[in-house]
């Protein structure tokens, strides 16, 4: 059993709330605040219920271009929330603990980037995570722990799995919604159609195998680099450029796709045509019979969109992960746009996080879907039936 905010006595309680606000940055702030907006419901509810909220989060990877403090995140949260949000430039120091202790009920403080401390970028067993400096120093200042960061639930890091070893633990509203939808795919309306695209070829093939073997998918539609891997496995000569792109992503993808086709060819659908860039820099669509092409496939073509739309029109549930092409380039956004529009006609439409959500946001159709996951890797892991350590840590 996992306790939720409905089970929490929040009034006056000091809460450590793990959120995921890892966002693209710009020179003057945040380039995208979607992840911050996702947690508004949880944080506002806790503040409205007079909790004293200490927010835990990370930004970027050590040494990366987007590795930074969380001051701009605190400023944006303060703008988004009805409740005031302060910023503390430390995470578990005496100052941080004092700031939590002195918080008035109904207020929040965003503590410093948890990844400023090397322990947070390591994996631990939960019992060992509870002994790290971050958890052992900060936990005594808290009465309970709330994990609302579904996007990090697959990472066995101290701020995810350590606190539940020391404190009563609860799922926030984002976590609760994600588990309710992604954890109950088997009871979603049938037929279930998975649309797998993007560049995470190995992950997508793993999802396809898992849902097909477990009987959760009636059809799997492939696109993007994933679709190209299946075409190559099926003997289609896409051209050296497309093959190189697939091999750069995974040396095993074509073999894995071929093995899956051997087992489930009747349920796996591949592109019928692709779009490439010609010498003039224009979009040109080619049927498979007209390949190979000298330039890499950048999108699916109109024939593929029409064929996939026919399947999606009859879908009870459409589960999408990954774009159909290089949607960032306006010349090659059509396949993703039209394919995803078709998916919204399903009785229930579910979108994985990461690049998929970014594509929908750029194309202006994000709000048309029933559920948009906040997690990329976590959503993929859950779709493959893997256990998420951050979720298991919340179980009583």
From Swiss-Prot:
Gene Ontology MF terms: ADP binding; ATP binding; phosphoglycerate kinase activity
Record GO cellular component, one term: cytosol
Annotated positions binding ATP: 328, 353-356
EC number: 2.7.2.3
Protein's pathway: Carbohydrate degradation; glycolysis; pyruvate from D-glyceraldehyde 3-phosphate: step 2/5
Record GO biological process: gluconeogenesis; glycolytic process
Residues bound to substrate: 20-22, 35, 58-61, 115, 155
Enzyme class: transferase
Catalytic activity, as annotated: (2R)-3-phosphoglycerate + ATP = (2R)-3-phospho-glyceroyl phosphate + ADP
Pfam families per UniProt: PGK
Keywords: ATP-binding, Cytoplasm, Glycolysis, Kinase, Nucleotide-binding, Transferase
Compartment list: Cytoplasm
Protein family: Belongs to the phosphoglycerate kinase family.
Subunit organization: Monomer.
PANTHER family noted in UniProt: PHOSPHOGLYCERATE KINASE, PHOSPHOGLYCERATE KINASE 1, CHLOROPLASTIC-RELATED
HAMAP family: Phosphoglyc_kinase
Protein name per Swiss-Prot or TrEMBL: Phosphoglycerate kinase
Species assigned in the record: Natronomonas pharaonis (strain ATCC 35678 / DSM 2160 / CIP 103997 / JCM 8858 / NBRC 14720 / NCIMB 2260 / Gabara)
Name of the coding gene: pgk
């Amino acid at each position: 059993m996992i306790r939720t905010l409905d089970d929490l006595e929040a009034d006056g309680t000091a809460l450590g709330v793990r959120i995921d606000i890892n966002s693209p940055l710009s020179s003057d702030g945040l380039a995208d605040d979607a992840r911050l907006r996702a947690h508004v419901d949880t944080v506002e509810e806790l503040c409205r219920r007079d909790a004293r909220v200490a927010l835990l989060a990370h930004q970027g990877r050590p040494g990366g271009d987007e590795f930074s403090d969380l001051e701009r995140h605190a400023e944006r949260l303060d703008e988004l929330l009805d409740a005031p949000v302060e910023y503390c430039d430390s995470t578990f120091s005496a100052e941080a603990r004092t700031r939590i202790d002195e918080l008035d009920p109904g207020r929040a403080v965003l503590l410093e980037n948890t990844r400023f401390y090397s322990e947070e970028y390591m994996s631990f067993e939960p019992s060992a995570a509870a002994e790290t400096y971050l958890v052992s120093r900060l936990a005594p200042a808290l009465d309970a722990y709330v994990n609302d960061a579904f996007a990090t639930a697959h990472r066995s890091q101290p701020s995810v799995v350590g606190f539940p070893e020391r404190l009563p633990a609860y799922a926030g509203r984002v976590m609760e919604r994600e588990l309710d939808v992604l954890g109950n795919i088997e009871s979603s309306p049938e037929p279930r159609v998975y649309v797998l695209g993007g560049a995470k070829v190995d992950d997508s093939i793993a999802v396809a195998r898992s849902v097909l073997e477990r009987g959760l998918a009636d059809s799997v539609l492939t696109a993007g680099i994933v679709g190209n891997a299946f075409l190559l496995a099926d003997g289609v000569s896409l051209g050296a450029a497309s093959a190189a792109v697939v091999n750069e992503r995974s040396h095993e993808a074509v073999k894995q796709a071929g093995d899956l086709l051997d087992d489930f060819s009747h349920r796996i659908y591949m592109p019928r045509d692709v779009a490439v860039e010609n010498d003039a820099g224009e979009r040109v669509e080619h049927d498979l019979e007209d390949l190979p092409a000298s330039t890499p496939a950048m999108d699916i073509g109109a024939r593929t969109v029409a064929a996939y739309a026919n399947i999606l029109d009859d879908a009870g549930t459409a589960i999408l992960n990954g774009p159909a092409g290089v949607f960032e380039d306006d010349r090659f956004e059509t396949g993703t746009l039209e394919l995803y529009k078709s998916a919204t006609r399903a009785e229930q439409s579910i979108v994985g996080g990461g690049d998929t959500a970014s594509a929908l946001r750029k194309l202006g159709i994000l709000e048309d879907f029933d559920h948009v996951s906040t997690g990329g890797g976590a959503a993929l892991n859950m779709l493959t039936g893997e256990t998420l350590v951050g979720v298991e840590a919340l179980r009583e």
